[in-house]
Amino acid sequence: MSHRYSSAVVLGASMSGLLAARALSGHFERVIIVERDVLPEGEALRKGVPQAAHAHGLLVSGYRVMDAYFPRMMSELEAMGAPVGDIVGDFLWFQYGRWKLRHPSGLRGITVSRPCLEAAMRRRVKRLGNVTFLESTDGVRPIFDPADGRVTGFIARSRDRSVNQTLDAELVVDASGRGSQSPKWLEESGFGKPEEISVKVNVGYATRICERRPGDLFNSIGVIVSGTPPTGTRAAGVLAAE
């Protein structure tokens, strides 16, 4: 395969980072993922993904995008034990004071733990011949061409601060999440700080993992109970996983 561009850097081996690396792999000769954590070999929680312990799943759009970028990924997850089914016919939904009618919708979804999903995606990304992972490494700052403002590289530093690396990059994708330093880097480089808009939603989560037995969840993949607005502010869900 011929590539139009030379090098790209992706900050963060998150879900968005892995998908970005996969998308870029078809256009760049080399893609480097810079990740602060030491990535686990298998399915395990890690510090950089604190939300991983909560319930996860893929609805229709996510399911289709994942399978488009990683063909047969859903079959691979299903083989790992992740439940796949119809998001209407195989789930129980309680909304506005009543149970929704179960029927085949033709819309597929999957319920899977975040560590399992990330592990499967990392394996697929590592099979790409032109994507490499730089683990236990912090992003320091991008490098810009002073003549025209184009990004030309990125400086990365090992977590123990013993090694600095200058990476060539025609594109830098920041998938580092809420701790992103991009606004600061842009301001320090003379581009101005982007306007930041935040929406406070006041939502909290609590999760418990339980052992599932055959026949639990009323022969469904998941049970979702939503509060009725405006007074019903609590919701609950029980999702099967691998």
Where are these regions (language model features)?
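N-terminal Rossmann-like FAD-binding beta1-loop-alpha1 element of flavoenzymes
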Residues: 3-38
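Short, well-ordered alpha-helices that flank and scaffold nucleotide-derived cofactor binding pockets
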Residues: 22, 26, 123, 188
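N-terminal FAD cofactor-binding segment of flavoenzymes
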Residues: 23, 27, 42-92
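Phosphate-handling catalytic cores of nucleic-acid transaction enzymes
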Residues: 34, 71, 99, 107, ...
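Flexible phosphate/Mg2+-sensing switch loops adjacent to catalytic phosphate-binding sites
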Residues: 36-39, 43-45, 194-200
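Short beta-strand to alpha-helix junction loop
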Residues: 57-58, 104-123, 134, 175, ...
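Helix-loop-beta segment of a Rossmann-like dinucleotide-binding subdomain
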Residues: 95-114, 151-153
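Predominantly flavin-linked oxidoreductase catalytic cores and closely associated redox partners
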Residues: 127-242
